[in-house]
């Protein structure tokens, strides 16, 4: 056995023939001695591609150290299956690491051949190449795919799998039905069934279970064919297969009508495993109108029905995972034989079962995410999008919310746009669930970095909600709270503050003072206070919000708790208490990794702010390492042109500068600076903040005139948007004074330093590190102008306060003690 043998289905003891295909596949894979060239088994459904791959894995397993099976029929599930190999390979990643991080580690380990060079990965039922090709490893091992998609023929070495040759069909039936069939009868059956392996398997299972004579089987097959031909059938499935299937169901109906009813219901799920507990008793508010409610509530009926389906090889029962799987071919045939009213009835049943399964589960709650994940593969195949039932639409939007709450924004967008297209066409623009879907859509596209589109969509939707639902409807309030983020992203901080004050009042009146939704509104208002520079009020409100959210029974989600936790660490840092900010940030980061995973969007946002706190606290190496990791993760997860990635880039450039990597920092900022106006506009505070950082790096790299020009322009912009009495603006003013001093304009630098220091004391207080930096820089200018007595007095006072605030060994204190200039930079907060 290989050292790692993962998820490979059991070997089929009735496997027959295919020796030429196995030899061709084996020799083809073994011939690739320098680099892996994937091979694909291609053919229509039911020809035995999967069985051939299973047989290959078992027959040649001695040639591999690792054999890993990956169900690949839905791209959303491929990565999670591949990520499971990380643990088996004992890769050095955190147990709470995200799926993408685990997949990257697995692909890298396979590419390097460490710890194993001989590996085989089997992607079963792969769809379009672009869905899977990105996660196919390259290295010294082998990759085998099975697929019905002809597109693989232009991508990989492909082996076409056709129906059995007649002698293989006969040999298979003789093995499958020992002592129950003659060779001539096997020939007759193979002819009638078109030599399709799946059809032969079903026929063989029926023969074994019932002992039916072949003549009777063929007569029934002929009689059932006429009815089946009267309904539509999939174009790539032969008639003989549909006839064989219908006969199996007909015989099963005589033994267990309940089993047939259950099977038909399962045909309207997706082809992924169906959790067994979906078929448990329905809650009372869902049981009304359910055609299966009686059976679902009676294990004496349900258990035998499931076992009958297994005996007839119509489902695969996995007792370990407690799931039931119906082959997609069987599902298609089952659906096609039913009249449309029956199809609609079974679809409603499946929708009810799906919705009931998570009726009590909050999609924001990370504890509920595995449950939602298990249902994800059934949403589109069951046509949830077509339902007009309010309970089902509510469930559908909860799935969207689960996706973006867990960080899968792209899948959330794809799903909600499918819902909107259908629901608007059926129900019109004023339907409550259409409006709610648009609210979710705006959240998703904002999280994907399309901030202007989110703003415009929320503006339109808010107007419709107020008109259709009313000012104080729950959906209207939820959108109002979300829309505050749009205003913050636009740099309209004062308008966002007014908006969020009103939102909080409405939430308190509607939900109460400590409801989880009210606490979200409080968190947003605390951020507004921060952006407007009122750090005392921001700290008070943020601490109150966090206290309520952390209480047992608050109902707040892990990501909302983490957002508030990080907000508290950030405001403590901006108040100048760097050591305590690090402590709070460390706790928040550990919570994010544990509750969400290390690459969840909110965990990465916390990591970015923790890096800033470490840098401010003088922990330069730790800050740089964390900033570098965070920037790489953001690029990988959301791309370079995203607000979180841009913020992580500034954090990294600042950490590089602090660590002395001046050239690298400047190169990064030269790339980032043009992206900020494209994201936020030409007159946004964050754009000016990025320019401030760029100017700083230009000056320390010797480009003095350009630095001065950029800082002057940035200061004018910040004066206009935020006024001079703001933390961001005063930071730019400190750096502009340093530009002037570097160019020899010492007196102008001193004058700017004096006015800036006065404002810093008024805004931040005498002991804030930024105030002390302004004072320390003014000391340098006074010394350069020969005003030594004035400089000495200011220096002594500044150092006393600095050492008390940051300690004698802090890098900034050392610079001030040596009468050298201090530089400060800008870090955009999470909005």
Question: Model features per residue range: what roles?
Answer:
Residues 1-425, 429-440, 445-467, 490-505, ...:
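Aliphatic-rich helical/repeat scaffold segments used for oligomerization and domain docking
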Residues 386, 425-430, 467-472, 505, ...:
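Short coil/turn linkers that connect adjacent helices within long alpha-helical scaffolds
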Residues 397-404, 432-447, 474-489, 516-531, ...:
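Conserved alpha-helical positions within TPR/SEL1-like repeat arrays
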Residues 460, 464-467, 471-482:
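Eukaryotic intrinsically disordered, low-complexity regions
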Residues 593, 604, 615, 627-776:
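Eukaryotic tandem repeat interaction scaffolds
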Residues 766-769, 776-777, 784, 788-831:
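C-terminal non-catalytic interaction modules
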